[in-house]
Amino acid sequence: MKDPYDVVKRHYVTEKAKMLEGLSLGGGEGKKKGSFCKDPKYTFVVAGDATKPMIAEAIEAIYSNKGVKVKKVNTVCVKPQPTRIFRGKRKGRTAGFKKAIVTFVDGHSIG
């Protein structure tokens, strides 16, 4: 297996990712179906060639001191987006990357 820090690059922090983490704080009860979930979910930026089993092993190795268990891993390849640089004169693209949404077993958390 590769070094876990080569597979998982960093924690991915956006408004949508934080909202997804916050859904697990409700304990599974909510007025609407699906408004809360029991299993906590966290988002990470991973290597482009990483597979789901590799990501699960790396997350469990990195957070072994907290004793987390991975239940499920979903991956998304984010495409590069067009940008304008230098007052719109030059056109470019942002870098594409792969992100993983990791679901932990109920009761396990990294936060």
From Swiss-Prot:
MF term (GO), any: rRNA binding
UniProt keyword terms in alphabetical order: Ribonucleoprotein, Ribosomal protein, RNA-binding, rRNA-binding
Gene3D superfamilies: 3.30.70.330
Cystine connections: none
Taxonomic superkingdom: Bacteria
An annotated GO BP: translation
Family matches, as InterPro entries: Nucleotide-bd_a/b_plait_sf, Ribosomal_uL23-like, Ribosomal_uL23/eL15/eS24_sf
Matches recorded under HAMAP family: Ribosomal_uL23_B (MF_01369_B)
Entry protein name: Large ribosomal subunit protein uL23
Source species: Chlamydia muridarum (strain MoPn / Nigg)
